[in-house]
Amino acid sequence: MMEKHGGKVTSDRRAGRRQHGQRCSASDAAPLVVVVILIVGALFLILGPTGSSSFTVPRIRVVFNEPVHVAVAAPPPPPPPAQMQAGANASSEEDSGLPPPRQLTDPPYSLGRTILGYDARRSAWLAAHPEFPARVAPAGRPRVLVVTGSAPARCPDPDGDHLLLRAFKNKVDYCRIHGLDVFYNTAFLDAEMSGFWAKLPLLRMLMVAHPEAELIWWVDSDAVFTDMLFEIPWERYAVHNLVLHGWEAKVFDEKSWIGVNTGSFLIRNCQWSLDLLDAWAPMGPRGPVRDRYGELFAEELSGRPPFEADDQSALIYLLVTQRQRWGDKVFIESSYDLNGFWEGIVDRYEELRRAGRDDGRWPFVTHFVGCKPCRRYADSYPAERCRRGMERAFNFADDQILKLYGFAHESLNTTAVRRVRNETGEPLDAGDEELGRLLHPTFRAARPT
């Protein structure tokens, strides 16, 4: 019984092996057929069909190490000779939407229609508007409009806009304490007068628009007031129309291109000044005109390199070559720093503060010439050196304001502040005449009736 059963089991197992072998043979044959089909198909595509079949397949040809020839468009024909120089000088400006620069063969540039009889018309306007006097309290000083500004676009360096903001805050502080009006410009009023020259059309426009302003005070954006208590000796310039920081000997004897500086100057609102602007401006249009005058200034002014014309060199050139016309009305100031060069100043602030004001020689204006705070790099000095110097100048000036309210910076190298005076409940200016004069200047007091 067991053998019978065992024989049946053995027979069943053999039958199972035969069936499994048949299945394996069938499954092994299937991949082989697929491989053969793929090989034949590939050969068919590569070698192409034979016979007279109308069906054609593109032939594939692989080539190595054969040079590739790319067709290059023919260059455009060269421009006419008269346009070549203009195109070379104007490409960057035209890309930014500006008109082509003025050429040497074009009519000279002008700020606009010549203004005649301005003094008489301004006097008539002032007489008709007594509520806007050209002289104001205290002591009947001239009404002054402080003018500054920066480019309309944001600075390439993100820190630049912050530095410009702090520089403007510094100017607002000084103007508020001394009762001066302030105008901040961020527009190019004339596309031809870019860079340093942008101030000329602006000054002319403000003179005509504000006849009540007796003096216009231009201050560069990178110039910082660093003696907030200093009052300009206005009466010293009563018979002069232009006040510049510099040295007469350097201008008229040496003909030095740095004999004066136009980073901070006063100009009177009168016919003489309008005529000066008209004589000054034709040397400033961007392009070949500015380049040509730059070469002329390099020949006529001592020590000047032959770069494009700048407004400072142009003004010195006018004073030197037309001294009889302009010289008598120009005051060149050297008794205080109307425009002090920053490099010899910024590291001495602590020393000056310890010495106090007894000698009266605190730098009035610290001008960061060559730093260009709006750019990622400086013209002549390491950017970090410039930024550190500006930080110290801002804080030195700001301490003089914060002191009015009982605070001061922890050091000139940081913006952190600390309290320096305990509050007593009395007015802040009690017992401090100088503090009271700044907190409550006389020009803000009501006039007696």
Curated annotation (Swiss-Prot):
Record carries keyword Nucleotide-binding: no
Main location: Golgi
Compartment(s) where it occurs, according to its Swiss-Prot or TrEMBL record: Golgi apparatus membrane
Lumenal side: 50-449
UniProt keyword Translocase present: no
Function, in words: Probable glycosyltransferase that may be involved in the biosynthesis of xyloglucan.
The protein's name in its UniProt record: Probable glycosyltransferase 5
Source organism of this protein record: Oryza sativa subsp. indica
